[in-house]
Amino acid sequence: MSGYMVGNDDKSDAMLNFTKAYQNNDIGSVKSIFSENVIFHINDTDLTFDEVNEGFSAGHNFFDNIKHSDADVSTMYYNDGQIFTNYWYTWSAVSKKTNNKITLKGYCWFKWENDKVVEVYNAFDPTAYIAEMAN
């Protein structure tokens, strides 16, 4: 499979807008980029948009200053018509309970069909995140 990759297109911008909305606890504001039946794979869990919106928003109850840094985004346009936007990032936040700052690396992709995101994959090691929430 081959194709081409770009970093300054509408789909890469949509990924960045989604991640900014997450950081601002406003994922609902970008719902229009997703298909009605979008499925999110968060590590090994499959979720709907509404479940992701609720779950990601709940993280703001435990952490302040949620940020993405070291972000790298690009969209792959494959010759077979598939389109994926890839996003590598460093997630950081400060625990509201312990005031500890935690940092973790993550990777996400959007799969596009008809200019809508139909599938999302997001992978990260949740160990430190879960430990801070349990404190």
What would you call each of these model-derived segments?
Residues 119-135:
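Low-complexity, intrinsically disordered terminal/linker segments enriched in charged
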Residues 82, 110-117:
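Short, solvent-exposed coil/turn segments at beta-strand boundaries
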Residues 34, 89-93, 108, 124:
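Short beta-strand segments enriched in hydrophobic/aromatic residues
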Residues 86, 101-107:
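Short, surface-exposed coil-to-beta transition loops
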Residues 57-98:
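Surface-exposed, charged secondary-structure patches
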Residues 37-67:
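Short solvent-exposed beta->alpha transition segments
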